[in-house]
Design a protein with these regions (language model features):
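Short beta-strand-plus-loop segments that form exposed binding edges in beta-rich domains
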Residues: 174-185
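Short, compositionally stereotyped local motifs that mark structural "simplifiers"
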Residues: 1-69, 87-91, 98-99, 104-111, ...
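Extracellular carbohydrate recognition and processing domains
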Residues: 151-161, 169
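Aromatic-lined ligand-binding clefts that engage carbohydrates, nucleic acids, or primary amines
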Residues: 123-139, 173
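Beta-strand acidic-aromatic groove motif in beta-rich domains, primarily in extracellular
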Residues: 183-194
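Extracellular Ig-like/FN3 beta-sandwich strand-entry sites
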Residues: 23-27, 128-130, 168-170
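Beta-strand signatures of extracellular beta-sandwich domains
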Residues: 1-3, 134, 139-141, 193-195
């Protein structure tokens, strides 16, 4: 069942039988009703009507991303603003390299080797369209807009998928990875990738490393 006016769904709300059609900004609230009448947790989906965000011109872009890392146990992104450690800067050719390769020994699983990493650069969008995004990173920003926010969540799965309208070409991207343990799940056990699909597609596919650029 679902509602389109922001109210909480009840067992007597509209039953989902066909794709939901909306014409403007809408808050969709969805729940599953069991045969017993018991309802699941409510999921909220914010639908925003957007024009295609324009691409940017970048002089002589090179494949890869710029990255900075800092040691420490961070549970919130804003804690990085007050971090008193030293940032280390480098470039990476693959988004998978945002994560430090380390052994899951006792010290690591106690959080002794935790750190934060921020990768920045550009993502190449192959054609105009509305794109759905999914990721287990702490945060993903595109065009300086927060499009994925998993802050504080257990990274074993993600329910914070988002969509954005993007024009063909390069768009600024920032990816935040916090190496920490939330709810007993080390974040480094999760995939360090971003998956996308156009609104006309059914399956998510991982963004290829060839789509990431730096200046």
């Amino acid at each position: 069942v679902y509602t389109l006016d922001g109210t909480t769904p009840t067992p007597s709300s509209t039953v989902y039988t066909v794709p939901i059609s909306v014409s403007g900004n809408t808050i969709i609230r969805i729940a599953t009703v069991l045969p017993t009448g018991k309802m699941s947790k409510i999921r909220t989906v914010e639908v925003e009507k957007q024009a295609y965000a324009p691409a940017v011109k970048v002089e002589a872009p090179k494949q890869g991303l710029k990255i900075k890392r800092i040691k420490g146990n961070f549970l919130k992104v804003n804690q990085l603003e007050l971090a008193d450690g030293t940032w280390e800067y480098t470039d990476i050719d693959s988004l998978k390299d945002i994560k430090i390769k380390q052994i899951d020994d006792a010290a690591t699983l106690r959080g002794a080797n935790n750190y934060a990493a921020i990768a920045e650069g550009y993502i190449n969008i192959p054609e105009d369209g509305v794109y759905y995004l999914s990721s287990r990173f702490e945060q993903v920003w595109i065009d300086n807009k927060l499009v994925i926010n998993n802050e504080g969540d257990v990274k074993a799965s993600t329910t914070n998928d988002s969509s954005v309208a993007l024009a063909k070409g390069l768009h600024p991207i920032k990816i935040v990875f916090l190496s920490n343990i939330v709810g007993g799940w080390p974040s480094w056990w999760s995939k360090t990738s971003i998956e996308m699909r156009k609104d006309s597609e059914q399956q998510f596919t991982e963004v290829d490393d060839s789509q990431y650029y730096k200046q």
